[in-house]
Structures are given as structure tokens and as C-alpha cells.
Design a protein with these regions (language model features):
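Intrinsically disordered, low-complexity terminal regions
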Residues: 1-239
Length: 239
């Protein structure tokens, strides 16, 4: 009624065990393009094809895969999250699993306790926090904060604003867009620091500039110019 569809599944005791023979419910729904989807479950997954509007989904155990939606708020205690395109804002969290987003047209907040976090292109401010796993961002057009306790951090192209990259154990590979001046503040507890950037004059008011703060407790740091051809082609691309 009122343009809403509510789906509920019975909570049988067998569905909460990891042993075979448990009960399960599979639901397939055809929705108009741009529909809103809200849901939660103890053990449930979500797979969407096509374009959704606002999508909020939370599960204790299960994978979440969307082609396109926005804004999105997705959380799983254990399982992968994969999004083709997020619009407006993306708030994504997994306790254990791979987290990939091809493109965020807007801002993003990413949390991953155990697993890699791989982002293609993001147009707004981005924050990524991880406990165990590498962080990779192909291209960022605004500020980036990327922190992991254990894992490498790769930023394929940054172009504007404050960039913070911190890892307790791992390498930093940060590339600045060609022609954009950058201020560098780089420290590693054990390892080398390399910068391929030439000295540049102070930018004029209103001119794009990047302020980079890089920290590694154990690992090398490399700063370079991004190749002209860099574009977000795959969130899973390795450096």
C-alpha cells in the first residue's frame, strides 16, 4: 500500500546455525528505477541490478552487491560489499570482507575491520578507516583521509585539498595530478622516503593545490606525479 512493499522472513531457530539443513528464504522483486530500499537481517544478503534510489541495508552475515544507488548506507558484520556507482553519499562498513566501489559521485565514508578497501573514482571528500587490509583509491578529486593499522595505501591520483595517509605497517604510494603543486609532510619509522616531484612555486589564490601528510610506522613512502592516462577503471586494480 502507498507504494511500499514489506517483506518479512520467519525467524526459525535453524537459520541461526552454520550447519547444513537450515531454513532460508529467497525473494526476487522487480522495482521501478530509482526505488528506495531499506532492509535488515541477522543472516541475509542483498543483490541489486539496475539503478536504485536511497538504499539502506544492514546484516550480521551476508554479501551486499549493488549496480547503482544513492545515497547508500550498507553494513555487514561478515561479508563482501561491492557497489558499481554510489550517488550523493556512500557509508559502507564490513567487519570482515572485501569492500569495492567503482565510483562515488559525492562523498564517502568507508570502514573495514578485516579486508581490502578498493575505490575507483570519488568526486567528494573521502574517509577510509581499516584495521587490517590495504587501501587503494584510483582517483580522488577532493580531500582524502586513509588510515589502516596493517596494510599498504595507494592513491593513484589526488588533485585537491588535504590528503592524509597513515599506516602502522605498510607502504605508501601517492600520486599527485600533473601540474598541481603539493606540500609534503612525510615520515616513516623504518624505511625510505622517495619524492619524484620537482620544486614548485607557491600556488596562486584559488589555484588547486594538495597538502599531503603521510605516515608509516614500518614501510617506504613514495610520492610521484600521476600519469596523464590515469582514470578510474577498476576498483580492484593493484598498484
Amino acid at each position: 500500500a502507498d507504494g511500499r512493499l514489506l517483506v518479512k522472513a520467519p525467524k526459525g531457530w535453524r537459520q541461526y546455525t552454520f550447519r547444513g539443513g537450515g531454513e532460508s528464504v529467497a525473494v526476487q522483486i522487480d522495482l521501478p528505477t530509482g526505488s528506495r530500499v531499506h532492509g535488515n537481517g541477522g543472516m541475509a544478503g542483498l543483490r541489486s541490478t539496475g539503478r536504485l534510489g536511497e538504499c539502506r541495508f544492514k546484516t550480521g552475515l551476508g554479501e551486499i552487491r549493488l549496480d547503482e544507488a544513492g545515497p547508500v548506507e550498507l553494513k555487514t558484520g561478515m561479508g563482501d560489499i561491492a557497489v558499481g556507482r554510489a550517488v550523493d553519499h556512500a557509508d559502507l562498513s564490513t567487519g570482515s570482507g572485501a569492500l569495492t566501489v567503482d565510483r562515488i559521485d559525492g562523498t564517502g565514508v568507508i570502514k573495514n575491520s578485516n579486508g581490502d578497501s578498493l575505490i575507483g573514482e570519488v568526486t567528494g571528500d573521502l574517509r577510509v578507516n581499516a584495521a587490517n587490509g590495504r587501501i587503494s583509491v584510483d582517483r580522488a578529486d577532493a580531500a582524502v583521509t586513509a588510515r589502516t593499522a596493517n596494510g599498504d595505501i595507494r592513491l593513484g591520483e589526488v588533485a585537491h585539498g588535504a590528503v592524509v595517509a597513515e599506516t602502522g605497517f605498510g607502504k605508501l604510494d601517492l600520486a599527485i595530478r600533473d601540474g598541481v603543486p603539493a606540500w609534503l609532510d612525510l615520515t616513516t619509522g623504518c624505511g625510505s622516503v622517495h619524492s619524484d616531484l620537482d620544486d614548485a612555486e607557491r600556488p596562486q589564490p584559488g589555484e588547486d593545490a594538495v597538502e599531503v601528510r603521510g605516515r608509516s610506522g614500518f614501510g617506504e613512502i613514495r610520492i610521484r606525479r600521476a600519469p596523464h592516462h590515469v582514470r578510474a577503471t577498476s576498483a580492484g586494480a593493484t598498484p
